[in-house]
Design a protein with these regions (language model features):
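Short coil turns that delineate tetratricopeptide repeat
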Residues: 14, 44-47
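Class I SAM-dependent methyltransferase SAM/SAH-binding core
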Residues: 114, 118-164
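A short acidic, Gly/Pro-enriched loop at the edge of an enzyme's catalytic core
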Residues: 166-175
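A short glycine-rich, Lys/Arg-flanked "PGG" loop and its adjoining helix->strand segment in the class I
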Residues: 188-203
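Short, glycine-/aromatic-enriched active-site segment of Class I SAM-dependent methyltransferases
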Residues: 206-224
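Short alpha-helix
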Residues: 223-239, 245
């Protein structure tokens, strides 16, 4: 879509986040990094906004910004999400959740699995061999396109997590949220939604960044941190039990480990 078309769509519906995201991308492709940042500032943080923000800042710092250079930089960046997550950010959340699964549900196979905030499908890829059915949900249409291209999911939905969980649908033996809850503050509604979709012997496995004190807080990178006390309390309120809660490092930022938790909840 052209910039003018997207701006027109946003005048008609200012809450259309998909159009906002595409507008930020369009400004970047046009070499207008500052304008792209202005649009990104109006969006909730997500893996994709972080990716685009990083690209915009790279462009602003770049000595040359001719159209060909910008297009090359953008295409390279958009296509390399997985490489960036695993390489530059030391993203290990799927591996951490696999280890946790082997502890709390050893030997389980042929599972119905739901991947919350599936992104490009990195967690789905890690768990595919345990799945009889693998479904995914993500807020970003572009991420879902990449996940679909892997050919590992049975069903993919573009939706926010609470909406997807509230709908009538199958029950799951395993619900995954790898590095997803850092984009949500209060987890009460999602925990309640998951509780309603878990099979009697089902598990929710997730990673989160560690917060201080009793509750949850917004960190400097616009990523939410949750305290152990909050996670335990929110689980109980949703009618879930804590089957496991261990210290973990789901990712690195600027070479430094980000402290977090790997958590297993069950019915």
């Amino acid at each position: 879509s052209s910039i003018s078309e997207l701006q027109r769509a946003l005048r008609l519906d200012p809450d259309m986040d998909v159009a906002r995201l595409r507008l930020a991308q369009a400004w970047l492709k046009a070499g207008e990094a500052q304008r792209a940042l202005g649009v990104l500032d109006t969006l909730e943080a997500s893996p994709q906004t972080q990716m685009l923000e990083q690209l915009a800042r790279t462009m602003l710092a770049a000595p040359r910004s001719d159209a060909g250079y910008v297009r090359h930089l953008f295409d390279q960046f958009a296509g390399d999400y997985d490489q960036r997550m695993i390489g530059q950010l030391g993203y290990t959340a799927p591996r951490i959740l696999l280890d946790l699964a082997s502890l709390v549900m050893p030997g389980r196979q042929d599972l119905a699995i739901l991947d919350l905030g599936c992104g490009t499908g990195l967690a789905g890829l890690a768990f595919k061999s345990f799945a009889a059915r693998l479904d995914g949900v993500d807020l970003s249409p572009l991420m879902v396109e990449k996940a679909r291209a892997r050919g590992i999911y049975d069903h993919l939905v573009v939706a926010d997590l609470e909406t997807a969980l509230a709908e009538q649908g199958p029950v799951y033996d395993l619900v995954l949220a790898a590095d997803t809850f850092v984009y949500l503050g209060d987890l009460a509604a999602v925990f309640a939604g998951v509780a309603g979709r878990l099979a009697p012997d089902g598990f929710l496995l997730f990673t989160t960044e560690a917060g201080e004190g009793e509750g949850f807080e917004l960190g400097p990178k616009r990523r939410w941190r949750h305290s152990e006390a909050y996670l335990r309390q929110a689980a109980i309120k949703a009618g879930l039990q804590v089957a496991g809660l261990v210290a973990a490092t789901p990712r690195h930022e600027k070479g430094q480990p980000v402290e977090g938790f790997a958590v297993a909840l069950c019915r």
